[in-house]
């Protein structure tokens, strides 16, 4: 039996329901970073500096350094060449997939079973059946880094046997900032993620090779989208110790 719990506060480790306390095991807010004093302090600073939001394109002639600073910080943290911030994890996934589909317009695409909708693109949907039955011979492969809400390992070694002419796009929303996201593969690897799950900010990110990220930052879908909220980006950038 399932329940809907209606409350006006973000849950922490425990939630109350019908007079009893239960452990909260939802698929977000993993670190409860919003309660960390350093994050709260830096978010307040960010709001004072950047007000409520900034919706202009990142390629506008008026630019702020805070976005690139966090991109460099997260690229270094996750040991990739470059990163591109987006307004959400779903947008990050869609932009990455759109970019690869334009780069290889005739390529076959295969989505693993249970892949998050962030990596869906009509008419392509996740393959039916179990992950072990998924055929991984398409040029573009999309999958989740780990199953959610039920934890399920997907990267079991097949990725090491892919070829260099394949592209593997992995949604890391439920691993990034929690466990290692290092993937050893000959394929061209692009990782996307929500930054709300562990990092606690309303944003998404694309991680990959510098050539891919540079090209994505010229793509109309990235250029035309509003950037991540700069106040939250500032908080994440200057509260990195809170995530360690």
Q: Where on the chain are the PLM-derived regions?
A:
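Active-site phosphate-binding strand-loop segment of PLP-dependent enzymes
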Residues: 126-170
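Conserved N-terminal alpha-helix of the aminotransferase class I/II PLP-enzyme fold
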Residues: 40-88
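Short, small-residue-enriched loops and turns at beta-alpha junctions
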Residues: 32-33, 59-64, 117, 146-151, ...
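N-terminal "arm"/small-domain region of PLP-dependent enzymes with the aminotransferase-like
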Residues: 1-54
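Conserved PLP-anchoring active-site segment centered on the Schiff-base-forming lysine
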Residues: 81, 99-120
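General beta-strand structural signal in soluble alpha/beta enzymes
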Residues: 24, 83-87, 109-112, 143, ...
């Amino acid at each position: 039996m399932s329940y809907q719990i209606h409350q006006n506060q973000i849950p922490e480790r425990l939630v109350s329901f019908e007079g009893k306390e239960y452990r909260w095991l939802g698929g977000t807010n993993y670190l409860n970073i919003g309660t960390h004093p350093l994050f709260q302090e830096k978010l307040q600073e960010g709001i004072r500096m950047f007000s409520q939001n900034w919706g202009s394109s990142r390629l506008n002639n008026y630019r702020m350094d805070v976005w690139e600073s966090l991109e460099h910080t997260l690229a270094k943290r996750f040991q990739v060449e470059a990163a591109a911030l987006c307004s959400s994890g779903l947008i990050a996934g869609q932009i990455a997939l759109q970019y690869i589909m334009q780069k290889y317009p005739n390529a076959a695409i295969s989505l693993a079973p249970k892949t998050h909708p962030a990596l869906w693109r009509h008419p392509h949907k996740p393959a039916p059946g179990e992950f072990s039955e998924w055929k991984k011979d398409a040029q573009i492969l999309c999958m989740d880094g780990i199953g959610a809400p039920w934890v399920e390992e997907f990267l079991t070694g097949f990725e090491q046997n892919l070829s260099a002419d394949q592209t593997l796009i992995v949604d890391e929303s439920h691993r990034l900032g929690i466990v290692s996201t290092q993937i050893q593969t000959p394929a061209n690897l692009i990782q996307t993620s929500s930054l709300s799950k562990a990092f606690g900010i309303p944003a998404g990110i694309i991680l990959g090779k510098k050539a891919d990220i540079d090209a994505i930052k010229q793509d109309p879908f990235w250029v035309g989208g509003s950037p991540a909220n700069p106040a939250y980006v500032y908080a994440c950038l200057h509260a990195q110790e809170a995530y360690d």
